[in-house]
Swiss-Prot record:
Keywords: ATP-binding, Chaperone, Metal-binding, Nucleotide-binding, Zinc. ATP-dependent specificity component of the Clp protease. It directs the protease to specific substrates. Can perform chaperone functions in the absence of ClpP. ATP binds at P120, T121, G122, S123, G124, K125, T126, L127. Zn(2+) binds at C15, C18, C37, C40. Residues 2-56 form the ClpX-type ZB domain. This is ATP-dependent Clp protease ATP-binding subunit ClpX. NCBIfam families: clpX, PRK05342.1. CDD domains: RecA-like_ClpX. GO terms for molecular function: ATP binding; ATP hydrolysis activity; ATP-dependent protein folding chaperone; protein dimerization activity; unfolded protein binding; zinc ion binding. Belongs to the ClpX chaperone family. GO terms for cellular component: HslUV protease complex. One of its GO terms (biological process) is cell division.
Length: 424
């Protein structure tokens, strides 16, 4: 089609749909014996968009995965944490089922089930939230609770979280309202003491108060396209009651709070019960018994805990679990580096003892799965630096001594059928 103002005879042209002349519109597009103006094109686009919106909810309702399907998908990417995956699968399924049925069933209002994840660093809290959002194909954003402050103070306003979510979906409010927000380091905004303070705590209890309404459900007014707020502008209205909030934190020291509550038979003096190290519960076992009172004693306010009714605890990853993480998930770290080396036409092999050494090193650093990448990256750095300049390398082998820093990776050359260290 071409843009036409007049035909060859100089005759005045009109839109075949609305009847407006070429002088009344900005553009007139010509087809075979027919014309359409820019205004009619815009109208057609609006009609199509509205029809897509009406059809989408029915499509979504039929496509809602079951808890078993959600759990199976999490199993593909997250090793261990079986109970946490089951809790998450049920909570997420119920949340989106509530959205698809209009927040109520037979006149009964369905409550919102935000989630609190408790577990040590590198146990998979963030990965679980990211994997869920990717599987459900919903917008996802992360926020760090330590950067948040009350409105009016220097720092990040809690409403900026919603703005980040809108940015992820090009400011489509309907999409944003189906999204997932993960707030990390939530334990760092615990108040500094059990007793309410008369002084302001703008990064602790004050932030909990600011997050209350956002997490429970409110209409957040967000400036369009990330601009600053000013009285004359129109705001985007986002209903946060439809957004799933997942809060996560390590809660270091919470196990001691739980131990004090559960260890009722300690006694004093000659009546004290002496427990050996074998009798003591592990941190993971203690955290699995967490109750709202323990979180209040830790420093979260009761109102905030009430907005996070679903609690899932994650255990510290064992050496065996770390080895599985290196090898088994669909996007396992070893598979990622093997794909990277394949781009150079080189095969990368990790021997079993190398994976064990990587896991032991991560355990010693107490960084969980998060520390695995830095260990592998350090071991492969020199090889990745040299490899593009080397010819005829067919294979690179990583063993235990490479991870320990005692030798260089083994390079196997195709043409000469010799084995050399990359440093030679």
């Amino acid at each position: 089609m071409t843009d036409k103002r007049k035909d060859g005879s100089g005759k005045l042209l009109y839109c075949s749909f609305c009847g407006k002349s070429q002088h009344e519109v900005r553009k007139l597009i010509a087809g075979p014996s027919v014309y359409i103006c820019d205004e009619c094109v815009d109208l057609c686009n609006d009609i199509i968009r509205e029809e897509i919106k009406e059809v989408a909810p029915h499509r979504e309702r039929s496509a809602l995965p079951t808890p078993h399907e959600i759990r199976r998908h999490l199993d593909d990417y997250v090793i261990g944490q079986e109970q946490a995956k089951k809790v998450l699968a049920v909570a997420v399924y119920n949340h989106y089922k509530r959205l698809r049925n209009g927040d109520s069933s037979n006149g009964i209002e369905l409550g919102k089930s935000n989630i609190l994840l408790i577990g040590p660093t590198g146990s998979g809290k963030t990965l679980l939230a990211e994997t869920l959002a990717r599987f459900l194909d919903v917008p996802f954003t992360m926020a760090d609770a330590t950067t948040l402050t009350e409105a009016g103070y220097v720092g990040e306003d809690v409403e900026n979280i919603i703005q980040k979510l809108l940015q992820k979906c090009d400011y489509d409010v309907q999409k944003a309202q189906r999204g997932i927000v993960y707030i990390d380091e939530i334990d760092k905004i615990s108040r500094k003491s059990d007793n309410p303070s008369i002084t302001r705590d703008v990064s602790g209890e004050g932030v909990q108060q600011a997050l209350l309404k956002l997490i429970e459900g409110t209409i957040a007014a967000v400036p369009p396209q990330g601009g600053r707020k000013h009285p004359q502008q129109e705001f985007l209205q986002v209903d946060t009651s439809k957004i799933l909030f997942i809060c996560g934190g390590a809660f270091a020291g919470l196990d001691k709070v739980i131990e004090q509550r559960t260890d009722t038979g300690r006694g004093i003096g000659f009546n004290a019960t002496v427990k050996g190290s074998a009798d003591k519960a592990t941190e993971g076992e203690l955290l699995s018994n967490v109750e709202p009172g323990d979180l209040i004693k830790f420093g979260l306010i009761p109102e905030f805990i009430g907005r996070l009714p679903v609690v899932a605890t994650l255990r510290e990853l064992s050496e065996e679990a770390l080895i599985q993480i290196l090898r088994e998930p669909k996007n396992a770290l070893t598979k990622q580096y093997q794909a990277l080396f394949n781009l150079e036409g080189v095969e990368l092999e990790f021997r079993d003892e190398a994976l064990t050494a990587i896991a032991k090193k991560a355990m010693a650093r107490k960084t969980g799965a998060r520390g695995l990448r830095s260990i592998v990256e350090a071991a492969l750095l020199d090889t990745m630096y040299d490899l593009p300049s080397l010819e005829s390398v067919d294979k690179v082998v990583i063993d235990e001594s490479v991870i320990a820093g005692q030798s260089e990776p083994l390079l196997i050359y195709g043409k000469h059928e010799t084995q050399q260290a990359s440093g030679e």
